[in-house]
Amino acid sequence: MTQNYRITLLSGDGIGPEIMAVAVDVLKAVGKQLDLNFEFKEALMGGVAIDATGEPLPEESLQACRDSDAVLLAAIGGYKWDNLPRPERPETGLLALRAGLGLFANRARLLFCPHVLDASSLKREVVEGVDIMVVRELTGGIYFGQPKGIFETETGKNEGSNTMAYGESEIDRIGRVGFETAKKRQGRLCSVDKANVLDVSQLWRDRIMALAADYPEVELSHLYVDNAAMQLVRWPKQFDTIVTGNLFGDILSDAAAMLTGSIGMLPSASLGASGPGVFEPVHGSAPDIAGQDKANPLAQVLSAAMMLRYGLDEPAASDPVEKAVLKVLDWGYPTGDIMSEGMKAVGCRKWGICY
């Protein structure tokens, strides 16, 4: 019997439409093989939505996402909209999407493909075999804490402030996602905070340690965020699963992505307690190469694979997509950003055809 799924596509800006087209072709191919029918619906988000409607996330687009089984997002933002007031910029649409769908946990998987190890800035022996999952809290912390803003002081000069705040329930919720994720992987969880100077991080550490009693099979460790950043570069093999707050996770995910040689290699999944999740590459919209067929679609395709696995509970469809990505690289067909000696660089469209 054919299984039907409604997928909302948010292609967004820059290279977004190019890499989304490849991912959709891949989903159609795997759907045909496994009798899965995907009903794709395009919706506006980001700069293209601002140009068309004046809003980075129109209500119509948010409702389309709510009505779907999963949301596949490509990339948003670009130079064109950088000078808009902050509340009107494309990136605010992403925050609104997460809040509107109740997404509180982001999983970003850092997996080193053996065929492109030489593209990494680190030595092969340092990165070979690395497989890290970063679990990041999405709806709290300094991005959402109040009060925040730019205020005029008594001296007549402006002062900017943001508030980093987490409640016990928020920490417990993301902490359990971290422990459950580690339990299904290698059983090691590293909690990243800044408990030596931040009160909010001390509460974070206290709650994570309290949760550990419910997961005796998981080995728990703690690192301050500055040390964690250093350790990711020094010896990434020590990590299995990392759980951390919104700001720290945002920074560490991007830093870790470049260890692969390109930020175009890192997929992510944003999930809530129920309802559709959002699946997207960690990278941005790369407006400098948009429309030139230079974009790396791997993270978008791997995000589609994460959608199949975590959003639609179709691991039998996710597995062949992930294996096919490795196979195309094994054939020696990378995009230019992960090119190594002996390989032949291909464009975004050609890479999709190779798949």
Swiss-Prot record:
Function recorded in the entry: Catalyzes the oxidation of 3-carboxy-2-hydroxy-4-methylpentanoate (3-isopropylmalate) to 3-carboxy-4-methyl-2-oxopentanoate. The product decarboxylates to 4-methyl-2 oxopentanoate.
EC code(s) of this entry: 1.1.1.85
Any GO BP annotation: L-leucine biosynthetic process
Residues bound to Mg(2+): 226, 250, 254
PANTHER family for the chain: 3-ISOPROPYLMALATE DEHYDROGENASE
PROSITE patterns in the cross-refs: IDH_IMDH
Organism: Arthrospira platensis (Spirulina platensis)
Keywords of this entry: Amino-acid biosynthesis, Branched-chain amino acid biosynthesis, Cytoplasm, Leucine biosynthesis, Magnesium, Manganese, Metal-binding, NAD, Oxidoreductase
Any Gene Ontology CC annotation: cytosol
Manner of cofactor binding, per the entry note: Binds 1 Mg(2+) or Mn(2+) ion per subunit.
Enzyme class, broadest EC rank: oxidoreductase
Chain residues that bind substrate: 98, 136, 226
Site label Important for catalysis, positions: 143, 194
Key word Oxidoreductase present: yes
UniProt subunit comment: Homodimer.
Name under which the protein is recorded: 3-isopropylmalate dehydrogenase
